[in-house]
Amino acid sequence: EWSVQIGAFDTQESSTAALKSAAKKLPRSYVMATKPQIVKAKSNSGTVYRARFSGLTRQKAIEGCRILKNCIVLSNTE
């Protein structure tokens, strides 16, 4: 399973807003096939909320990142 991470944010609200904004740039069928996800994580500067579209194949994750441009593709082990 692969994911597209669109950013890491200081608040859960910012992460949710980023997912909604990114979803508007992607084809509806693409968004419907994903699992939007917010992953809470610790960083050196405190807590961050990582906004991701998960549940993708590697190829679909790459396609999504090509559309969004400012993102990273992750395998489920990352």
Residue ranges and their predicted role:
Residues I6-G7:
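Local beta-strand/beta-hairpin segments that build beta-sheet-rich folds
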